[in-house]
A protein has these predicted regions:
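Absolute protein N-terminus
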Residues: 1-3
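Compact, glycine-rich, soluble single-domain proteins
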Residues: 6-57, 86
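C-terminal structural segments of small proteins and small subunits
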Residues: 53-87
Length: 87
């Protein structure tokens, strides 16, 4: 299962939001991948997430595979929509 999400927080997917995304992803029994354009990375690796350098207004796709896939997608979606609780 996958979902497209728009990055809306002011500074984009920098260190703090990346850490929050990875922390959320690691709570679930699922393989999680995050894509921007043609680049796909491991959603449970902070260094990989930061390499995406997703800026405000850009779209990412979150894909999850495994027993907790649906719950993982919903949790990450809520986090992104909340602007990572930064604003």
């Amino acid at each position: 299962m996958s979902k497209k999400l728009k990055i809306n927080n002011l500074k984009g997917l920098h260190a703090r939001p990346s850490a929050k995304l990875v922390k959320a992803a690691n709570k679930f029994d699922a393989d999680i991948y995050v894509s921007k354009g043609d680049q796909t990375v491991n959603g449970k690796s902070i260094m990989s997430i930061m390499q995406l350098a997703a800026a405000r207004g850009q779209e990412i796709t979150v894909k999850a595979v495994g027993p907790d896939a649906e719950e993982a997608i919903e949790s990450i979606s809520r986090l992104v929509k909340s602007k990572f609780f930064e604003e």
